[in-house]
């Protein structure tokens, strides 16, 4: 498992000081009802929102808020996070319970893992 997680760290160009955080970021509640990605996903979503908002204001300082809001919505959404998660092959790293292992990892889980990694 550690070798597999090291590959992911290499992909995202970040080495976790506490590997438990990475494991939690990849763990669905069906695997671990307590130490799963839900809170990290919540935080990641907020961090992503702040970063994208700041960048949009830098790139478009004179743009109307309505236009900025549309640009923001096109960049910060579950589909975009899914695309990024899929490009990182997070479906191969997601840790799910036995009831979820029978089928392919759902798009939402990939998207959620992506936000949790942020």
State the predicted function of each range.
Residues 1-118:
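RNase III-family endoribonuclease catalytic core
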